[in-house]
């Protein structure tokens, strides 16, 4: 799949990122991950991101990363394209990128580098180096320490033909409008704020109709139904989903930092697809919080 074909795929439909399965000892659980992918793939996501932020990329060893990407690519070979999360320091990100390409990933989601303060010129140089290390398509994720401007993105687009996507995790509407207007159809644009459904209607109005769904991991039917309501501009249905599910969900998610990942793993366990615990420094939901989530999920009906 060439970068432009990937761009076309990412320009419509719902995207998601499977959680990564760990056993009770916290090690990668391949059989559970395969079962998860086989369950989720038929629901109709346009693409899946393996070892992304919700997949706890930041906590994976290099050897685990290779096994996770290979498992995802092999399991979904005939059903849905797999993009691999990559990140960290530049040379580390390049190693991950080249390994994901070797293993058959159709594209990359370039996560922000970790911790080190840097100018956005430096961040742009980091993005360019990763893009030029591979031939497959790359989506850059503006979030946290990565705050690329329209001018820098335009320069990167000229230098890196395989940079085909922009994912927004900042929620800076002025910046998003500026990027969308400046870059036009050069990129596919993805909404990437935590629990992106809450912002989906607003982002669609900005020209960003595609987003990645975390709740697809445990209420996939609801996630797809909500996406279709967004796509057909059914504001009444969208409002009902937000009132009945997403706002109560946020009340649980917002209780602790890091729960944007932890609550997804809790939901997967309640749905019968236990992915094991999150790894430190994240913490799992308490039993009371899991009960609250289970009651909320039960109200949504069979998935």
Curated annotation (Swiss-Prot):
It comes from the Bacteria. GO terms for molecular function: 4-hydroxy-tetrahydrodipicolinate synthase activity; 5-dehydro-4-deoxyglucarate dehydratase activity. It catalyses: 5-dehydro-4-deoxy-D-glucarate + H(+) = 2,5-dioxopentanoate + CO2 + H2O. This is Probable 5-dehydro-4-deoxyglucarate dehydratase. One of its GO terms (biological process) is D-glucarate catabolic process. Its EC number is 4.2.1.41. It comes from Pseudomonas syringae pv. syringae (strain B728a). Keywords: Lyase. The keyword Lyase applies. SMART domains: DHDPS (SM01130).
